[in-house]
Curated annotation (Swiss-Prot):
GO terms for cellular component: cytoplasm. PANTHER family: IMPACT FAMILY MEMBER YIGZ (PTHR16301:SF20), IMPACT-RELATED (PTHR16301). Belongs to the IMPACT family. This is IMPACT family member in pol 5'region. It comes from the Bacteria. It comes from Thermus thermophilus. InterPro entries: EFG_III/V (IPR035647), Impact (IPR023582), Impact_N (IPR001498), Impact_N_sf (IPR036956), Ribosomal_Su5_D2-typ_SF (IPR020568), UPF0029_Impact_CS (IPR020569). One of its GO terms (biological process) is regulation of translational initiation.
Length: 179
């Protein structure tokens, strides 16, 4: 509570703009006076002041940048308490609440997954499905005249090579890696 106004900050990871917008839609508080937010996903960033004068969205974005975070969305909700805070007070309130929420939030390292695409003839599809199930991997499939194209994301750390080797062995070399 700052000068009788109540501020609540909510933060979450967001791997895409769609995830950020879904989080904002789910956590926005319609009864609040303002729902200001900011998010950063790689080079993409956005912020909104939600009608609050003196641009509180930018201090929220600054809190994200000062914390050195990426792929994150922060929503700050204000319930007006009757006292106007002025330009500096709004910047400190929104930015400070956002910074505190980010400081307290659990953090995880960002991992860039390896994308792999390969094709196999139809007789090998069942074997490929079995290996992917055994390794708890999901793949997008596209059916082509000569077989099936699989596109999957593998965790970083060298998993791609062993997985492709196992698939190649399983299909007796009848696997064509794209790219």
């Amino acid at each position: 509570i700052i000068q009788r106004s109540r501020f609540l900050a909510k933060a979450a990871p967001a791997a895409s703009e769609e995830e950020a917008l879904a989080f904002l839609a789910a956590h926005r508080e319609p009864q609040a006076t303002h729902n200001a937010y900011a998010y950063r996903i790689g080079p993409l960033y956005r912020f909104s002041d939600d009608g609050e004068p003196r641009a509180p969205g930018r201090p929220i974005l600054h809190a994200i940048e000062a914390a050195g975070l990426d792929r994150v969305v922060v929503l700050v909700v204000r319930y007006f308490g009757g006292v106007k805070l002025g330009a500096g007070g709004l910047v400190r309130a929104y930015g400070g609440v956002a910074a505190e929420a980010l400081r307290r939030a659990p953090k995880a390292p960002l991992l860039d997954w390896v994308e792999v695409a390969f094709r196999v003839p139809f007789p090998e599809v069942g074997r490929v499905h079995g290996l992917l199930r055994a390794r708890h991997l999901e793949a997008e499939e596209a059916y082509l005249p000569e077989g099936v194209r699989f596109a999957l994301r593998l965790p970083p750390g060298g998993e791609g090579g062993p997985c492709l080797k196992a698939l190649s062995d399983l299909t007796r070399g009848r696997l064509w890696v794209e790219g």
